[in-house]
Structure formats: structure tokens, C-alpha cells
């Protein structure tokens, strides 16, 4: 119990410093989450519509995801330097896999009967994507967003090893 009191006392004494680090952590993670979310959604839609590209893009996303985070940060340092930029690039690369895979899986899981019915009513491919496929795939896509956000927030702490804030 005494240890807990000492830890709380340190947090209270250095409150501004900890809040500044917390803000830096959220900024780095937030930028990476937005970038990975947008890019992952676009790549997922692309490979769902162009099936022949799915193995290539999914393999690349899986490769980035399997590299240990501290190693990926080390690999990027010679190219992007030390700091927030390197951390954001690495976190974005990590966040792509859950987004790409879940977007692809969600869109490919839409029933072909529903798509054919929409085509029969005169819908264009863009209308089918925006009005049929994406709304029906939204649950799976949001599960990917959740996984990506949790993973990105947790890995962001490791970015401090390469001089990134937080």
C-alpha cells in the first residue's frame, strides 16, 4: 500500500509532464490510426473489387505485421530518422493489416444474390459498393477498426525507444 501511495505522489508532483507525454502519445497514435484506417479501407475495397491483387496486398500487409515492432522501428531509422515521423510510419504499417483484411472479408462476405438483385434494378458498380456492400460489411470493418486502434495505442509506447514522444 505504501508503494502505491509513493507512485501516486510522483504522478501528482509531475502531473504536467505526464499529461504532456500522454498528449504526445495520443497525437502519434491518432495520426497513425487515421492514416491506417483510410489506407486500409481503400486497399481493402481495391482488393475486394480486383480479386487478382488480393494475395499480393494481403501478403505484404501480413509481412509488415509479423515484423517485431522494435525491429521495424530500427529498420526505418536509416530512411526516416529518429522521431515522430518514424513512429507514425511504423504504426501505420502495423495498422494496415487488420483494416485491409477486415474490409476485404466484409465486402467479400456480402451475398451474391443481393448484389445480383441490385444489378437487376439498374444499380451501377459504385452504387452497389456504397449502398450495398459497404453498409453490409460495416460490422466486420468496425471490428477491424477496433483491433487496429487497440493495437496501435499499445505499440505506440514502444516508439519512445526511437525518440518519439509519449
Where are each of the predicted segments found?
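Short membrane-interfacial helix/loop motifs at transmembrane-helix boundaries
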Residues: 1-14
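Membrane-embedded alpha-helices of multi-pass transport/permease systems
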Residues: 38-43, 86-115, 145-153, 157
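Glycine-rich helix-loop "coupling/hinge" segments at transmembrane-helix boundaries
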Residues: 77-78, 155-166
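Cytoplasmic-entry segments and transmembrane alpha-helices of multi-pass inner-membrane transporters
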Residues: 43-76, 91, 101-105, 116
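Loop-to-helix entry region at the N-terminal start of transmembrane alpha-helices
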Residues: 20, 24-28, 77-98, 138
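Transmembrane alpha-helix signature in integral membrane proteins
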Residues: 18-46
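Short cytoplasmic-facing helical segments at TM-TM junctions of multi-pass membrane proteins
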Residues: 103-141
Amino acid at each position: 500500500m505504501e508503494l502505491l501511495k509513493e507512485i501516486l505522489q510522483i504522478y501528482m508532483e509531475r502531473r504536467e509532464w505526464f499529461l504532456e507525454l500522454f498528449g504526445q502519445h495520443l497525437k502519434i497514435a491518432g495520426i497513425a490510426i487515421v492514416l491506417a484506417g483510410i489506407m486500409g479501407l481503400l486497399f481493402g475495397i481495391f482488393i475486394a473489387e480486383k480479386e487478382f491483387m488480393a494475395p499480393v496486398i494481403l501478403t505484404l500487409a501480413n509481412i509488415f505485421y509479423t515484423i517485431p515492432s522494435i525491429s521495424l522501428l530500427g529498420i526505418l531509422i536509416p530512411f526516416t530518422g529518429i522521431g515522430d515521423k518514424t513512429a507514425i510510419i511504423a504504426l501505420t504499417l502495423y495498422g494496415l493489416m487488420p483494416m485491409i483484411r477486415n474490409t476485404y472479408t466484409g465486402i467479400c462476405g456480402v451475398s451474391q444474390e443481393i448484389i445480383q438483385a441490385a444489378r437487376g434494378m439498374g444499380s451501377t458498380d459504385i452504387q452497389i459498393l456504397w449502398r450495398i456492400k459497404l453498409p453490409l460489411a460495416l460490422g466486420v470493418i468496425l471490428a477491424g477498426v477496433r483491433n487496429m486502434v487497440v493495437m496501435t495505442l499499445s505499440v505506440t509506447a514502444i516508439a519512445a525507444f526511437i525518440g518519439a514522444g509519449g
